[in-house]
């Protein structure tokens, strides 16, 4: 249960004022641009800042770290500040390093598989070919925002909406995951590097 809670924390109200929906032609062109970008991504590494907003708390919870992704499914989230925590996805296995204590589990149940797939898709921005979301696209300043609503009842228990913010190069700059309670988790990526070599040891715990 702790691992599931952590994954939801990792992943985890919409006011549309000032947002301009993309036309059908614009939306199609944007999706094609993102899909083309995704096909070129073999690896990605980035720093991130994660902000967790809870309604009952006066201040948001902020954590920082690094993320490493190697297509198609290897992913390492490293929290470095204010605590040390790693979670590594490798196909159907998940490994967790909690301040030096390593544990392992199989991602063979329904919720783990969905969350695993969701995390990888969110990082890469490859959400448009999934049948589990209703997608609406907006212009928001210099960014393009994809607003996704889960269709799956299992995911809806944990996630109300997902907002992906794409930069001009069609990569994800920011992710906002809104829970049914309207609490949310927002992750901002900085210093992104694409297709630079990542040693296999990064995905080994």
Give the ranges of each region predicted by the language model:
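An acidic-aromatic
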Residues: 20, 66-117, 185
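Positively charged n-region of N-terminal signal peptides that target proteins for export
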Residues: 1-5
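Short hydrophobic/aromatic-rich beta-strand segments that constitute the beta-sheet cores
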Residues: 48, 75-79, 94-97, 146-148, ...
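Flexible, surface-exposed loop/linker segments and immediately adjacent secondary-structure boundaries
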Residues: 104-143
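N-terminal leader/targeting segments and the immediate start of mature chains
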Residues: 18-49, 53-59, 204-205
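Gly/Pro-enriched, hydrophobic low-complexity segments
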Residues: 128-134, 139-205
């Amino acid at each position: 249960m702790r691992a599931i809670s952590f994954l939801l924390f990792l992943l985890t109200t919409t006011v549309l004022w000032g947002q301009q929906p993309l036309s059908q032609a614009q939306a199609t062109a944007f999706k094609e641009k993102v899909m083309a970008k995704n096909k070129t991504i073999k690896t990605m590494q980035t720093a991130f800042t994660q902000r967790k907003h809870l309604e009952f708390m006066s201040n948001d919870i902020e954590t920082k770290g690094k993320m490493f992704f190697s297509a198609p499914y290897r992913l390492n989230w490293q929290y470095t500040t204010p605590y040390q925590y790693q979670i590594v996805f490798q196909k159907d296995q998940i490994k967790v390093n909690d301040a030096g204590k390593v544990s392992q589990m199989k991602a063979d149940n329904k919720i783990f598989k969905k969350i695993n797939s969701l995390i990888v898709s969110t990082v890469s921005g490859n959400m448009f070919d999934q049948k589990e979301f209703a997608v609406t696209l907006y212009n928001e300043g210099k960014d393009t925002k994809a607003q996704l609503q889960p269709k799956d009842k299992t995911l809806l228990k944990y996630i109300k909406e997902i907002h992906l913010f794409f930069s001009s190069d069609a990569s994800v700059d920011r992710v906002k995951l809104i829970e049914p309670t309207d609490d949310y988790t927002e992750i901002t990526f900085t210093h992104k590097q694409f297709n630079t070599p990542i040693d296999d040891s990064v995905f080994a715990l």
